[in-house]
């Protein structure tokens, strides 16, 4: 079984896209579980039609590797998912801290001359997500890359 992030073509942000994924994967040896887009087009602004997507078979909601930057957006999303027994999968990353970094900040990134992403960018974003998740009695699965926490 595979859970599929919504960053597909087309983006899994509407019932038609989920139906298309289910149709295309019907005869495969692996069962696909769609993680629908948390926001329209995975753009981080407007919440997708979560109830319709859940009814169409979405097992969770995420914008994939795109972190939700707007606290109000993810707060509303947690509120919705808490009422429909679903969860949010978010990659924590405060872009005001990670900016244009391309790898984890470390002695190695400095040695190679690569702009590093401080682990703090994930920690601050994760803390926000955990607080909003608890506030809404919701569920969160966070995928991280720094190993900082």
Task: Please describe what each predicted stretch is.
Residues 21-27, 50-55:
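Acidic (Asp/Glu)-rich catalytic clusters
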Residues 14-16, 30-31, 81-86:
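Short acidic, glycine/proline-enriched helix-loop-strand junctions
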Residues 7-11, 38-41, 67:
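Short histidine/acidic/glycine/proline-rich micro-motifs that form metal-
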Residues 23-38:
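A glycine-rich helix N-cap at a beta->alpha junction
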Residues 45-149:
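Histidine/acidic residue-rich metal-binding segments in metalloenzymes
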Residues 1-6, 32-36, 59-63, 110-113:
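Short beta-strands and strand-loop turn motifs
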Residues 1-26:
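Metal-associated gating/positioning segment near the N- to mid-region
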């Amino acid at each position: 079984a595979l859970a599929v992030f919504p960053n597909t073509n087309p983006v899994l942000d509407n019932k038609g896209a989920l139906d298309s994924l289910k149709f295309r994967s019907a005869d495969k040896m692996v069962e696909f579980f769609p993680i629908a887009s948390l926001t329209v087009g995975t753009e981080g602004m407007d919440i997708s039609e979560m109830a319709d997507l859940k009814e169409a078979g979405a097992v969770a909601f995420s914008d994939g590797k795109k972190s939700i930057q707007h606290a109000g957006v993810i707060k509303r999303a947690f509120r919705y998912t808490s009422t429909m027994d679903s969860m949010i999968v978010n990659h924590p990353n405060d872009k005001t801290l990670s900016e244009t970094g391309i790898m984890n900040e470390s002695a190695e990134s400095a040695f190679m001359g690569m702009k590093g992403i401080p682990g703090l960018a994930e920690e601050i974003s994760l803390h926000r997500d955990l607080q909003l998740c608890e506030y809404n009695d919701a569920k969160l699965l966070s995928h991280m890359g720094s190993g900082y926490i």
